[in-house]
A protein has these predicted regions:
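Active-site beta->alpha loop and helix N-cap motifs at the rims of alpha/beta catalytic domains
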Residues: 2-155
């Protein structure tokens, strides 16, 4: 398991490299794996020490489930453990986060980047329980906490 002591240098937050038709309301499969590969290789080649994807650029709530799975699996395969890879798995409820973590756990990704479900205000105790539940269910995944008090409706 990775710890914060193992992480250093530059962390690149990678967008979900989209296909040309991604803005079309009828579009599906809008992840460009070719662009993702070029972008990920460029970030690592330019010196990124850690990569994070599907974070708060909007991917966690705008990608279709199959698109999320495509970007997770492709990013892990392309990265091939060259640098630590944290995959965003935030969701609007714990069940969705668990489903996303299960997908990430099937890959070579280092861990997950997760903010608490935030549709309704929460408490520090609930947030801690949420992260504990994720850690207990996915002991092989490192967890990077994404903490944004104004957005997540809780301050830790």
């Amino acid at each position: 398991m990775i710890s914060s002591a193992d992480l250093g240098g530059l962390m690149a937050m990678m967008p979900a490299f989209a296909t040309d038709d991604a803005a079309d309301i009828h579009a599906t499969n809008t992840i460009s794996v070719k662009r993702l590969e070029a972008g990920l290789n460029r970030m690592i080649g330019d010196g990124a020490n850690v990569i994070a994807t599907t974070g708060s650029f909007g991917e966690f709530h705008t990608l279709l489930p199959e698109e999320y799975e495509t970007i997770v699996r492709a990013a892990a395969e392309i990265n091939d453990r060259r640098v630590p890879l944290f995959v965003g798995a935030t969701g609007l409820n714990t069940r969705e986060v668990m489903r996303k973590c299960a997908i990430v756990a099937e890959t070579s990704a280092t861990g997950v980047l997760i903010g608490v479900p935030f549709y309704f205000p929460s408490s520090p105790a609930n947030a801690i329980r949420f992260y504990r539940d994720i850690a207990e269910n996915f002991p092989t995944l490192g967890i990077m906490i994404h903490h944004n008090p104004p957005l997540h409706n809780v301050k830790l």
